[in-house]
Amino acid sequence: MTDEPSQPLDGEDLATAHWEDARHWISIYADLIEFKRGILDRIWRDLTKLQPVAQRAAEVDVKIIEGQMQGYQVRLDLWYTRIRELNGLLLDPEGRMIRYKGKDATLTVREFQLVKILLDHPYRYFTVSQILKEAWAEPNLFPEEVRNYVQRIRKIMVELEIPCDVVNRLGRGYALEFRAQQ
């Protein structure tokens, strides 16, 4: 059985003129890759516990999953290219810069990490503890520090006139939401 992992998913339109759609597809493909990575980790962890026949079957499954992941990576790379073409919001990891329509701002390391995780996963809510662990890998920082960085990011987005907001929902956390294009 051959899977066509590099084919677009239903509803995917690489010709979209909306950069928020591109960010959604980036998030989807990144999540698919991470999901498959988790499956592979479980398979490798459990492989030695299986009978030889089951081990061979699992090895076939691993090849299929790796092929799917390669296809997802191709699609992810296409979306990263597309978002750059859309003349929209760009992140420069080397310079820790955020750019939008000819305006830019240099971010601190933590500001950049926070913006990146929110932009990589638009509309997904992150609790303070998730931000501390996933964005900064420093779970021992104080929750107030997250709130301070969120305020700083909001201010930068207003200054650059970026059409998105960092919202906070009680019990859910923080998420980046795009405003409708006008």
What residue spans do the PLM features occupy?
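A structural micro-motif at secondary-structure boundaries
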Residues: L90-Q113, A175-Q182
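Short, charged, intrinsically disordered terminal tails
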Residues: T2-D13, Y80-R84, Q181-Q182
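Minor-groove-contacting beta-hairpin "wing" of winged helix-turn-helix DNA-binding domains
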Residues: D165-E177
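Amphipathic alpha-helical coiled-coil segments
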Residues: D61-R84
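Alpha-helical initiation/capping and key positions within long helical/coiled-coil segments
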Residues: I28, F35, A57, D61-I64, ...
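Short E/K-rich amphipathic alpha-helical oligomerization segments
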Residues: D13-T16, L32-D61
